């Protein structure tokens, strides 16, 4: 399926002004071009990623322009293979293949990767984390966690889940004794290893590219005002910020998001680690100031690991899927009228984003109930 989509994308792009290739892929490739001639990837406007992504895509500058699309598609498949390995430890191999197909054969996932979006790299890193944790390779898992946070900020929250997962039963009579009894050597490995890798990656990139690296890779994302292709309920606020220079409080937008991402692992992290990461990521994306289609990949990668013996396979799960699709369709209709037809539909677009948000909050409740 991915090979067909990759070839279709090449054919389509040659014949249509509306490209199959994601505009972000052109940004990645342009940044890689600057790296190939010894310049900073941040010479390319709107490149807001670690330089490592541009370095990974260097083959695009040497006769293989579709290299990144193949890399992301292969990453998808490797993530699927790791899912099968993880699921096979709990259920039969045949059932593992069935559940992993929700990722491997998912057209949404395949299209996102073959269009040239880099989220598949985060997918393989996320599944590799779980795989290594289950294999008791905690040091290696901690290094991958540190690299993941360097690559994109959001995996930092998985560290909270891992700390809870590796905590020991409470002992002692005083608060301090109970607190100290929770600590374990694996928690220390997670903290030390991830901080070490995160620091090394950042120091290296800062040495090579200086303050623009920090500004565009990290600082930009705390105050970003992207309003195009944004499913978030903050869409209209961000539009006014970007158009009129108004400034809403970013802190208030982050508070519910960060609170949920900390509370969910505290409640569920010990008993269901894959489910905790799924719920954490779903909550993070739902409450994020910017929410685009590729962000759904962040939590969909955990779905096959959560489905076995889950309430999501019941009627409630079907309702969740229906609401998830309907919410996106309603938003996309308004977005098409705005961006392609030039109609003034800001209020309907905001209302459809608000409805999608409420749908996702209901879905989050069902997910938490199933853990």
UniProtKB/Swiss-Prot annotation:
Q: In which pathway does it act?
A: Glycolipid biosynthesis; glycosylphosphatidylinositol-anchor biosynthesis
Membrane topology label: Multi-pass membrane protein
Q: Which top class of enzyme applies to this chain?
A: transferase
E.C. designation(s):
2.4.1.-
Query: Keywords of this protein's UniProt record, alphabetized?
Result: Cell wall biogenesis/degradation, Endoplasmic reticulum, Glycosyltransferase, GPI-anchor biosynthesis, Membrane, Transferase, Transmembrane, Transmembrane helix
Span-the-membrane segments of this chain are: 64-84, 120-140, 144-164, 190-210, 248-268, 290-310, 318-338, 344-364
| Gene Ontology cellular component annotations, sorted alphabetically | endoplasmic reticulum; endoplasmic reticulum membrane; glycosylphosphatidylinositol-mannosyltransferase I complex
User: What molecular function terms (GO) are annotated for this protein?
Assistant: glycolipid 1,4-alpha-mannosyltransferase activity; mannosyltransferase activity; NADPH binding
First-listed, main subcellular location of the protein, grouped into a coarse class = endoplasmic reticulum
| Source taxon at top rank | Eukaryota
Q: Tell me where it resides.
A: Endoplasmic reticulum membrane
Q: Which PANTHER family match?
A: GPI MANNOSYLTRANSFERASE 1 (PTHR12886:SF0), PIG-M MANNOSYLTRANSFERASE (PTHR12886)
Q: Which family does it belong to?
A: Belongs to the PIGM family.
The molecule here is called GPI mannosyltransferase 1
Q: Which organism is it from?
A: Schizosaccharomyces pombe (strain 972 / ATCC 24843) (Fission yeast)
Q: Name the gene.
A: gpi14
